[in-house]
Swiss-Prot record:
Belongs to the herpesviridae polymerase accessory protein family. Keywords: DNA replication, DNA-binding. It holds the Pfam family Herpes_PAP. GO terms for biological process: DNA replication; viral genome replication. It comes from Human herpesvirus 7 (strain JI) (HHV-7). Residues 1-24, 284-306, 325-364 are annotated as: Disordered. The gene is U27. This is DNA polymerase processivity factor. InterPro entries: DNA_clamp_sf, Herpes_PAP. GO terms for molecular function: DNA binding; DNA polymerase processivity factor activity. SUPFAM superfamilies: DNA clamp (SSF55979). It comes from the Viruses. Accessory subunit of the DNA polymerase that acts to increase the processivity of polymerization.
Amino acid sequence: MDRSNREHHSHRDHREHRDSKEPPTMAFHMKTWKTINKPLRAFAKLLRENTTVTFTPQPAIIIQSAKNHLVLKLIIHAECLYITDTDHFSTKTINNFVPLFDSFMGIISNPDVTKLYIQHDSDLYTRFLVTASDICAQASIPCVNGQEIVRESGKSALRIDLDHSTVTEILKWLAPVTKNKRSNKNEMTLAQIVVQVNPPSIKFLTDLNEIEFAHSGKVVFHDAKCMRLVLSSKNLQQAFSTCAVLKSSCSLRAIAGKEYKLFLIAKNVFLTVEAYLSQEQVKDDPKFERQAKTEEKGEKNHKVEEGNNFFCKQETQHKITSYMVPTKNGGTGTNFFNEKEDSESDDSAHFDYTPNSKRQRCGM
């Protein structure tokens, strides 16, 4: 064989080897996956509509859900994942809704799954390979572009750490407000958060009730500034419910911009949960305005001195976008595993409550 023929065969063999090479693949460490399966089932019910999934070469998986004045984000850390070729695995984003499987969250939270591969062999789509028992399925999911990952930006003017029991107490307190008006979905109930400095305390208020926490071993003030936040009570309940799934402490922060935005974060070794809440515009609500003025009078009596241990300068806050990606309207798609939804299962974020019209003060 002459030299030209040898070079031709060499190039052909190299091309065939390159074409047959497995594309960069992300997968779960199965032992870790089993450890986080139960919280993932709870997150699958909280993060459904208007949700995107981003795969990064760190590796990490970022699930982000956008609602009106609320963004919820779940990050699956590198301790749970591995990638066969980090140099050639590009960041990719898809919609949570996955034909044939119902949703990506439904796949990773299903205990029957024995293997899941996420492959990058095109910038236009993401390939899934899923096995469960004696079943094996493959699907190519189109990528979506222009989806912003919301991140905390700059220092916050407020940082308070709440232990898990305090988060549970807040959810029980919010339950009467968020559950008793389900019949009127268009009616929004508001919740106020009022922070005072001397002495440090945080108060949650609604039309029905209020609850207050002072500085203690369960509620630790690191930075504080007198402020009042006006939020949707339903958004606040969803944010705390998402953080409560991890059963760890939750950090509450307020980041300054044109107006303060509330930021909640809870984390463990494998998962991080973040919630970003924008304030609601209050109009034509005399009852709420009277209540707000009463609280503002209390705030004016507590001036923040320069050099105070609880003072923190204002920083610029990023813009929270509302991209609202298209999903299947309300219903459950064709599920590959034929798994029935059970909103009252042990994995649901459910809190019992006893209605109480009296004001509460919790000094721990």
